[in-house]
Amino acid sequence: MEGPTHLKATNDHRYEEKTRKREERETIDIRKEGSRGEKNNMDIISILPAECISHIVSCTTPQDACRSSLVSHLFRIAADSDIVWERFLPQGYKEIISSSLNSLSKKDLYFHLCNHPIIIGNGNMSMALEKQSGKKCYMVGARELTAIWGDTPPYWQWISLPESRFSQVAELNYVWWLDIKGYIETKNLSPRTTYAAYFVYQLSSQDNPGTAATPVTLCVAYEHSAVAVEHSVILDPVTYEGTAPPHARYRGDGWFEIEMGEFVTEEDNATVVCSLVETSDYNCKSGLIVEGIELRPKE
C-alpha cells in the first residue's frame, strides 16, 4: 500500500509534467505567431513597388542603404537604384564631375567620389565625399592659402610633387615669421555638421630644426568672431628630443596632417578662418612643404 509521501511525489511529478507540456505548447504558439508576423511583414514588403522601397531607403543614409540591400533580393534592387544614390550625391554634382563619369551608375559615382577627390576651383581645391554619411570633404590647396611673403620667390617657391593632388604645392625656402591662413565659405560644406580642419604638409630633407621643433599656434574660428580657441603643436611627426608627444599623423598618401581645430556649419554664408602662426621665435624656418588645409566631417 502506497503511503502519503509516495502519493505526494507522484502528484508533484504529474503537475510538473503538465506544466512542462503547457509551456512547450505556449512556446510553439508564440513561434508560430512570430513566424506568421514575419511572413505578413514580408508579404507587405513584397507587394510594395521597388520604386516605393527606393524612396524609403533614400531617406536613410548611405551606410543604411548598404545594410538594407542584405535584407532580400527586392531590397537589394531597390537599395542599388539611382533613386537612392542620387539623393546621397551633393547638390550641383553634375556641374563639377568629368563627362567620363556620366556612364557610371549613381551608386558607383558615389563611391568614386568617396575614393577619388575631384579637383575644382581653377585646380586649387578638391572635393570628395565621406563614405558613411555622404557629407562633403574639402581641401583648400596651397595656391588658395595666404602666407606672409608667400609671393616673394626668395622666401617661398612653387614646386610640383607626384604625390600631390594639385599641380603645385608651396615650399618654404626661409622666413623668420610663419603665418599661413586659409578661408573657407561654409556654403561649400554640408550644413549642420561638425567639421575638423587639418593642415597637410611635408618636411623636406633641407628642413631646419627651427621649423620642426618650434611650436606653432593653430586656430580655427569664424571670421570676425570674438571667440577663438588656439593651441600649440610641433610639426615634427616624431617626438622631438623627448620634449613633447608627436601631434602629426601620417595620412598614407605621402603627407602628414595635424588637426587645427573644429567648427560647426550653422550658417550658409559664413567664412571660417584656419591659421598656422609662429611669429615669436626669430629663428630661421625652412623646408616646410604645404599641400593645403583639408576639412572633413568629424567622426
Language model feature labels by segment:
Residues M1, E24-T27, S105, V229-H231:
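Short intrinsically disordered, low-complexity coil segments enriched in acidic
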Residues M1-G3, K298-E299:
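A positional/structural detector of protein chain ends, strongest at the extreme C-terminus
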Residues E2, G34-R36, D80-S81:
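Membrane engagement elements in two modes
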Residues T5-H13:
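Extreme N-terminal basic, low-complexity initiation segments
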Residues K8, E26-I28, N40, E51, ...:
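Residue-level marker of intrinsically disordered, low-complexity segments enriched
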Residues R14-R36:
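Intrinsically disordered, glycine-rich low-complexity segments
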Residues E38-I77, S100:
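N-terminal Skp1-binding subsegment of the F-box domain
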Residues I47, H55, H73, I77-A78, ...:
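Plant-skewed but cross-kingdom recognition/interaction modules and surfaces
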